[in-house]
Structures are given as C-alpha cells and as structure tokens.
C-alpha cells in the first residue's frame, strides 16, 4: 500500500483557464476606429492608446503561449481585478501550480519628458513596478489567509513575477526564491523576459509528486479569488 498516495488527486490533470486569455481585439479595433473618426486634436491621444494596448496584448500573448506550451496542469486567471477588505489591484496572469501561486504583472515603459526633466538638480525617476508586484502579491496572500485558503506559513508560496522585455535569456533560470524585503511573508519579486516565461514555468512550477494546491485546497483558493473579483 502506498502510504503517501493522495486519494483526492485527479489521475489526469490539465491546464484550466478559469478566466480565459483574451486578445482584446474588440478594444483595439474600437480605439483604432476612434482615431480615424475623432476630431484632429484628439487623434494623437487615440493613436497612442491604440498602439500601447496592441503592444501590451502582444506581450501578454507571449506569456499565454508559454503557459500553454509548458504542458503543465495549471489553473489560470487572465486580467483579473481583485478588491479585498484591505486593497485592490489588477493581476495580468494569476497562475496556480502544484506548489506555487504566481502573480504575474508586466513592466511598463516609463515616459519621461526629458526636455522638462533637469537631471542636474534631481534624481532620475525610480521604477516602481517591482514594489507594485510585491504589493499585489501581498494583497492576494493576505486575502487567501483571511479566507483560510493559505496558512501563515504558506504565504511564501505566493510568488510575484514581473515580466520585463529588458531582461536577458538567463532570467528564466531557476533562482532561489527569497523573502520580500518589504512585505512580510511573501516571496521577493522575480523579473523574467517574456520570451522565456515557458522555461521559467518548467523550472519553477513543475509537476510535484505531492502537490499542495489540488482538489479541495485548490477549490478554497479559487473560491476566495472569485469572491474578490470585480
């Protein structure tokens, strides 16, 4: 008799999109149409919004493709906004694997008006996305803990990942998951290039012999997430 066999574990597990990926083509087309029909003085505004959304979705497609190609039995939410008793925030991809809950956000290009920015008397603006990723992961971890879907000792299983085009191919390599220096309990944010996200998943979210987040535990997590979705 296998003393370690978990009866509740399904024999065949597969990728499940709880909130499916959406290429947001309707939004993109609406912005494009508005740029063609709007008053001349508004054209640049709509063209910029259209270009930025199209570029953003292209990056999201790379990550969605990596999730599918990995072949891992993941549970995934795409572009989900959560509001809890403590805070609110949008998660681009929320991925639940056998042992980790991955909060994926995308690094944005910061627009700096250099002609109005005098570097002689001020520091360069600091990128805030790493802290924002950890803050969002902390919000989720706290909410899951309040709803008894995670114990206080399991908060470090919530891992924030920041997708950054400027990272190199080595960003997919498995790194030791360290504790956040700012937020209690959760893991430190990792920065990963979108092109190698599939490899990152395979190295960090592999199928576990003794999975934690399956069956009833997985349902408790998804129930808690669903309660917070707006």
Residues of each region from the PLM?
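Surface-exposed interaction regions that form or flank ligand-binding interfaces
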Residues: 1-89, 96-102, 110-230
């Amino acid at each position: 008799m296998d003393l370690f066999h978990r009866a509740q574990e399904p024999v065949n597990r597969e990728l499940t999109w709880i909130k499916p990926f959406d290429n947001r083509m309707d939004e993109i087309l609406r912005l494009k149409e508005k740029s063609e029909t709007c008053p001349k003085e508004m054209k640049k505004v709509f063209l910029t919004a259209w270009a930025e959304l199209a570029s953003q979705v292209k990056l999201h497609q790379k990550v969605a493709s990596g999730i599918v190609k990995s072949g891992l039995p993941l549970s995934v939410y795409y572009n989900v906004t959560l509001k809890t008793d403590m805070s609110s925030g949008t998660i681009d991809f929320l991925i639940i694997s056998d042992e980790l809950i991955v909060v994926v956000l995308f690094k944005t290009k910061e627009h700096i008006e250099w002609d109005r920015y005098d570097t002689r008397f001020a520091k360069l603006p600091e990128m805030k996305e790493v802290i924002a990723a950890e803050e969002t992961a902390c919000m989720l971890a706290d909410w899951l803990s309040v709803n008894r879907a995670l114990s206080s000792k399991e908060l470090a299983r919530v891992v924030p990942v920041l997708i950054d085009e400027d990272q190199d191919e080595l960003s997919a390599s498995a790194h030791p998951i360290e504790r956040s220096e700012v937020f209690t309990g959760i893991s430190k944010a990792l920065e990963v290039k979108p092109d190698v996200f599939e490899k990152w998943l395979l190295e960090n979210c592999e199928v576990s012999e003794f999975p934690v987040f399956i069956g009833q535990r997985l349902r408790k997590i998804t129930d808690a997430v669903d309660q917070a979705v707006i």
